Amino acid sequence: MLDIRLIREQPDLVKASLGRTGVDPAQVDAVLAYDEQRRALLREVEQLKALRNAVSKEIGKMSDAAARDAKIAEMRAVGDRIAELDRELAAVEEQQYAALMELRNLPHPSVPDGPDETYNVVIAQEGEPRTFDFTPKPHWELGEALDIIDFERGVKLSGSRFYVLKGPGARLQRALIQWMLDLHGKQGYDEVYTPFVVKEQCMWGARQLPKFRDNLYRDVEDDLWLVPTAEVPVTNLHRDEILDADQLPLRYCAYTPCFRREKMSAGRDVRGIKRGHQFDKVEMYMFVRPETSYDELEKLRADAEETCRLLGLPFRTKELCTGDLGFAATRTYDIEVWAPGQGEWLEVSSCSNVEAFQARAANIRYRPEPGARPEYVHTLNGSGLGLPRTLIAILENYQQADGSVVIPEVLRPYMGGIEVIRRT
């Protein structure tokens, strides 16, 4: 959520910044128009309340009953007008809030300009893609041949874009989650295990609403929402709190399944497990002082890259351009791993600084020093990593000519002695 004071005091700067992402300046003008209405109504309400207070004091001193009754009737009309204005004010404030929540975050000045993902900039690449002496298979062929991915039964259970992991495939998924959580603990993140359903207020605080409403699953009867990412519950751990400066930075990691309707991806990536309605992810999340947030973004990126490195996966890091930047982000790095069976790079982590955009919506503040006025924290989030794309990359990079898949060394302690997945 953007700062209304910034919009009010520097509208041209806000329009120019949002214009880099394709936002129509009329959206900013709408917020300003509601803001002026709201302030005009507030002025009128305050003037009438001041008048009522002054006249009330006069009435107490009046000896003429007729004159006093006339003043009382006059003030009753003033009270009715105040009540009417309060209703108008509430409606305008609701409209202004809705317009404000439609505005995305401002991109950082350093973010490269560009209309779409083709303008993203590769800033790092590590690990040489493996050279095969056979034609590598895509993961869906490997998974079915090894009997570790069952697409048919996934569809039978839940419909399209669902699947079942079996035997060592299910164990490999679990091993990845446990290993990632252990790794991030060593990197300085405190593990939390949160609910997978949240109140609507949490969706607003994490800025999933209103933009992504059509992509979310909701229980209408109880007004609870399935989480699309652990970012949602973890953001709201400190909603409506004032943190002490010495608590910061707070760094968390969390595993959750993620639920997305994928309406915006209809017809894309229909084969395999690359894009599903339910998938697992380990998330890294930070609450930090504003002056340190871009240093923390570099740590977040380094920690995600280290995860890929330890798994032995070739990866590259991109900085996203303005046209591909997420709604809440000011700056984002995407980390992609090579999938030789499909011949493409797969995004497994997106590391973003959202500055105070979520904190302002969720009212998360900190006190820079004892007695100081509270300020909004900055928040950052990054996948560490997303599954099943990490699973895809392991299957395709570690496949052997006989169709078996070697388990990465770091995962073997979590695999109960399994070092190679073979068809049994």
UniProtKB/Swiss-Prot annotation:
A GO CC annotation given for this chain: cytoplasm
Encoding gene per record: serS
Residues making up the signal peptide according to the UniProt record: none
NCBIfam families per record: serS
Organism field: Roseiflexus sp. (strain RS-1)
Domain writeup: Consists of two distinct domains, a catalytic core and a N-terminal extension that is involved in tRNA binding.
Any one GO biological process: seryl-tRNA aminoacylation
Keywords: Aminoacyl-tRNA synthetase, ATP-binding, Cytoplasm, Ligase, Nucleotide-binding, Protein biosynthesis
Catalysis performed (reactions): tRNA(Ser) + L-serine + ATP = L-seryl-tRNA(Ser) + AMP + diphosphate + H(+); tRNA(Sec) + L-serine + ATP = L-seryl-tRNA(Sec) + AMP + diphosphate + H(+)
GO molecular function: ATP binding; serine-tRNA ligase activity
Main location: cytoplasm
Purpose: Catalyzes the attachment of serine to tRNA(Ser). Is also able to aminoacylate tRNA(Sec) with serine, to form the misacylated tRNA L-seryl-tRNA(Sec), which will be further converted into selenocysteinyl-tRNA(Sec).
Tagged with keyword rRNA-binding: no
Protein family according to the UniProt entry: Belongs to the class-II aminoacyl-tRNA synthetase family. Type-1 seryl-tRNA synthetase subfamily.
EC number: 6.1.1.11
One Pfam family, short name: Seryl_tRNA_N
InterPro entries for this protein: aa-tRNA-synt_IIb, aa-tRNA-synth_II, aa-tRNA-synth_II/BPL/LPL, Ser-tRNA-ligase_type_1, Ser-tRNA-synth_1_N, SerRS_1_N_sf, SerRS_core, tRNA-bd_arm
Subcellular location: Cytoplasm
Protein name (record): Serine--tRNA ligase
Amino-acid positions noted as binding L-serine in the UniProt annotation, renumbered to this chain: 229-231, 283, 383
